[in-house]
Amino acid sequence: MCRFVIYKGTSPVQLCHLLTRPCHSIINQAFDSRLRLDRRRPINGDGFGVGWYDCTYDQELGSQPCIFTSVTPAWNNVNLTRLAEKIKSPLIFAHVRATTAGTLSLDNCHPFQFGKLMFMHNGGIAEFPKIKRRLQSYLPDDLFNMVNGNTGRSIQLRKLPNAYAKTFTPDQLRQAMVETIAEINVMTEEAGITEPSLLNFCVTDGESVVATRYISSRTDEAASLWFSSGTTFNEFAEGGHYKMSKMDKRENIILIASEPLTFEKADWMEIRTNHMVVVTPKMNLLQIPIIDKYYVPPSDPASMNRTTSFAAGKGLLSPRREITAETENCPAISI
């Protein structure tokens, strides 16, 4: 039942406007999820992480992202609160974790960094231990030696482009995610695994962003994923009530999140199951289908009849698709 949020903007934003100040910030989602309900792990308290790129390039510092992780609950980490008030970035990844695979350790806290690239994921590979050994045997030495955790991130690394290249294209990152998903499907099928895998992957090079919403099933919904875009994202009422404003046709800000950060229904669009979102360096947002045997085109009535029970049972989707409020400060909204 992990959560993540991505910010990409033409101007840098303080981390606190994503992490701490909104009444439904990702930190609040760690203990007060409204969209995803998981009776097994109701709290995302198994660590957190935030990664960001510098506002301007510095030759001495390089182009790699900085990542801060901890195994403590995000809402109880005073250092995170302090950093969030003092750091600005035009591209931010943040993640709160509820462990489903692997131990409670820094090595398993998202996001992860490999050269210039940063990535994180949500969901899980079905019966991952059955393919873990085979997967690791495919890794080249440099990747094998850097993977210390055991959450399945090694399969993402395998298909990524050269992390030390100076530049990447959005299509390179998009293709890497397509190939990653295809390889997972081949491995699970050959291992006789029939349970679907829920694969929400995110990767960035600091310029482009790719995020997938995917499930290896033609009849089930994938884990939730939303996006919001506009010209400003700010607090419009006391108590951490934020909204996305659209002053013109420009996209100055793009947010991608497991669960909306605001209770403004008009702010958010749901990403279709078995699609990916690609954000280009020029802030163009593309929603692209992941076409394989599990893809159901929107023209097919079956695309409207995917069931929510599987993802809901994993705590990755609400069966009602409703955010409910239990306090006066956060009004209810159906999505």
What are these model-predicted stretches?
Residues 1-121, 125-335:
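Conserved short alpha-helical segments that host acidic/polar catalytic motifs at enzyme active sites
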